[in-house]
């Protein structure tokens, strides 16, 4: 389950407590189970072919259909990151600085884990480690950053209303939060 660590040393591990803190940012965190056994088996692989990615996406389309109906999402893809990817650190570097997006950043972590950092309205900071079967929606214009945990492994479904709004717009905010994971 998700873990929220605040700059003041407070740690939350219960979804209700985490959701209460994230509500200050209008960030949504949900638990979406993966019930298809074949999908769970595929997700054990370190990397996936394009065909395997499509099988996984199709098996999870119930969630995509829900997002299409409720919020107008138009597209989704599956990103698979692991240590054997060439230039992984370079790829991730553009998200490890404080930034915003013109569109919501919506992720459904289906394997591995990632860390979203946030700047709260009072200027304090925190980091949320999200794990398999957790869905997060970071609203447009929310100041945040992202990095992988020390395992450097994640499989995440990305949902888009448009890909045009998903370019990072960097801010000058210095990340003060002492990350507990190696980047």
Curated annotation (Swiss-Prot):
GO terms for biological process: L-methionine salvage from methylthioadenosine; L-methionine salvage from S-adenosylmethionine. Pathway: Amino-acid biosynthesis; L-methionine biosynthesis via salvage pathway; L-methionine from S-methyl-5-thio-alpha-D-ribose 1-phosphate: step 5/6. It catalyses: 1,2-dihydroxy-5-(methylsulfanyl)pent-1-en-3-one + O2 = 3-(methylsulfanyl)propanoate + CO + formate + 2 H(+); 1,2-dihydroxy-5-(methylsulfanyl)pent-1-en-3-one + O2 = 4-methylsulfanyl-2-oxobutanoate + formate + 2 H(+). Binds 1 Fe(2+) cation per monomer. Binds 1 nickel ion per monomer. It is an enzyme of class 1 (oxidoreductase). Keywords: Amino-acid biosynthesis, Dioxygenase, Iron, Metal-binding, Methionine biosynthesis, Nickel, Oxidoreductase. Pfam families: ARD. The record marks 107 as: Important to generate the dianion. Ni(2+) binds at residues 99, 101, 105, 144. The record marks 104 as: May play a role in transmitting local conformational changes. The keyword Isomerase does not apply. The keyword Nucleotide-binding does not apply. Fe(2+) binds at residues 99, 101, 105, 144. GO terms for molecular function: acireductone dioxygenase (Ni2+-requiring) activity; acireductone dioxygenase [iron(II)-requiring] activity; iron ion binding; nickel cation binding. Its cofactor is Fe(2+); Ni(2+). Its EC number is 1.13.11.54, 1.13.11.53. SUPFAM superfamilies: RmlC-like cupins. Belongs to the acireductone dioxygenase (ARD) family. Monomer. Catalyzes 2 different reactions between oxygen and the acireductone 1,2-dihydroxy-3-keto-5-methylthiopentene (DHK-MTPene) depending upon the metal bound in the active site. Fe-containing acireductone dioxygenase (Fe-ARD) produces formate and 2-keto-4-methylthiobutyrate (KMTB), the alpha-ketoacid precursor of methionine in the methionine recycle pathway. Ni-containing acireductone dioxygenase (Ni-ARD) produces methylthiopropionate, carbon monoxide and formate, and does not lie on the methionine recycle pathway. This is Acireductone dioxygenase. It comes from Microcystis aeruginosa. The lineage of its organism: Bacteria, Bacillati, Cyanobacteriota, Cyanophyceae, Oscillatoriophycideae.
